[in-house]
Curated annotation (Swiss-Prot):
Function of the protein: One of the primary rRNA binding proteins, it binds directly to 16S rRNA central domain where it helps coordinate assembly of the platform of the 30S subunit.
SUPFAM superfamilies: Ribosomal protein S8
Alphabetized PROSITE patterns for the sequence: RIBOSOMAL_S8 (PS00053)
Keyword terms, alphabetized: Ribonucleoprotein, Ribosomal protein, RNA-binding, rRNA-binding
UniProt family annotation: Belongs to the universal ribosomal protein uS8 family.
Name recorded for this polypeptide: Small ribosomal subunit protein uS8
Gene: rpsH
Assembly and binders: Part of the 30S ribosomal subunit. Contacts proteins S5 and S12.
PANTHER family: 40S RIBOSOMAL PROTEIN S15A
UniProt key word Protease: no
GO cellular component terms, semicolon-separated: ribonucleoprotein complex; ribosome
GO BP annotations listed: translation
Domain of life where this protein originates: Bacteria
Molecular function GO terms recorded: rRNA binding; structural constituent of ribosome
Length: 132
């Protein structure tokens, strides 16, 4: 059975594993998910990620990041643009998450960018998710 929204599936798996204090979470691999994982790592939300061959296809494994007392580094994740309702933002209207404390992930003509990177480049695009 095909998945209608693989990004929402990724974010839901990440949210559930984070809530349960798991150290890692695995999911089917795609280039888009790898780029999202790159952004999450560069912004300090996850410790790292790895791609491994599975019986069918490849598996993306994210290593979650916790503080010294096992407090979560990810407080919340929200999928914004969905297959049934796409959400786009112009370069002048790029949303800020929690006044700049969180990150908006955008799909632009320059690839996947954070809200700050997109504003700096002056490009808009589809708002995929908010992470804080």
């Amino acid at each position: 059975m095909t998945m209608t929204d693989p990004v929402a599936d990724m974010l839901t798996r990440l949210r559930n594993a984070n809530s349960a204090h798991h150290d890692t979470v695995s999911m089917p691999h795609s280039k888009l998910k790898s780029h999202i994982a790159d952004i999450l790592k560069s912004e300090g939300f996850i410790a790292g990620w790895d791609v491994a061959d599975a019986r069918v296809g490849q598996t993306l494994t994210l290593s979650l990041k916790f503080g010294p007392d096992r407090e979560r580094s990810i407080r919340g994740i929200k999928r914004v643009s969905k297959p049934g309702l796409r959400v786009y933002a112009k370069s002048a209207e790029i949303p800020q998450v929690l006044g700049g404390l969180g990150v908006a992930i955008l799909s632009t003509s320059s690839g996947l960018l954070t809200d700050r990177q997109a504003a700096k480049k002056g490009v808009g695009g589809e708002v995929l998710a908010y992470v804080w």
